[in-house]
Amino acid sequence: MTARHIFTATASFFILCAQATAADRVVYKGDVGPGQGKHILFIASDHEYRGEETCPSIARIMAKRYGFKCTVLFGQTEAGLIKPGSSLIPGIEEIEKADMLFLFLRFVHPEDAWMEKFEEYLKRGGPVIGLRTTTHAFNGLKGKYAYHNYNGGDDDFVGGFGRQVLGETWNPGLGAGHYGRNHKFATAMHTVPAQNEHPVMRGVKEMHAMAGAYSARPMPNSTILATNRVLESMEVGAKPLEDKAPQPAAWVRTYRFKGGEEGRAFCSTQGASEDILSEGVRRMIINATLWCMKMEDSIKADADISFVGPYNPTTFNFKPSITDAKPGDIEGYDTPILKPKKER
């Protein structure tokens, strides 16, 4: 084989490797806006609430409307198909270049090399958003990273990543769990009056979430921005149940991981893919993303936060809405996330 043939073969190999790597994630690159030069990393892998729909839809808005580069990682099968709840989440090296981490996870247990990079981000105080089940992001981790599990028992890290970074975990016995009948009762959220002027709540009006409410008792240094009410049905405008007092539904805080730099965090017990059909819920999440990056000046009450491209969320349950989709299927701004609803 000649040197030319060797060079050509080598070049082809690296091109194929690059293409294979790029195929396991989706990237949306904004052109103009305050987010120019900044990178948001979204990681979606939960079993029920369609984080694989929420994350790319918010990523498109942040890229198109604000100019960020947004990379979305997904739980996947070995064959590269999107598998909600999978602990195989390729692309974590993107976290090294991330300015913001946006999480929608539930009970995952990635390998140690993945967790090592995740921890490095936390040590530098990188801003973090966690939606819904991300309070119990990790379960089943073994060895040196087991303390991140939602039921982590270390005295200095009780409640694992969820409690110590986001401010809450999953512990129904201590008041952090389902509140009302999920799939039967929807949720209304209301801004805490004292926080009407908080940047995260700027321009936020009515908030209706289809996913059922959670109860929560955020860490003491949390600022509660919104509380919930359990509704008597799934309908917008349904009456709240009188025997269900309001619970914290969205809050901000700062965290410091293992003596590292201080970082900002936002958590909401809502955020399912149908929840963000509510403009109020969506605006709060987008505002929070900017707040976490200390970009309060870019939060405008009347900013355009409309969806970019077709968005047809599926109703949450444990049966995956998709079984044959790859990240590349939602490249660009015009592809449906994830598939359009069938005509009725």
Residue spans for each PLM region:
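Proline-centered loop/turn at the N-terminus of a beta-strand
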Residues: 127-129, 223, 264
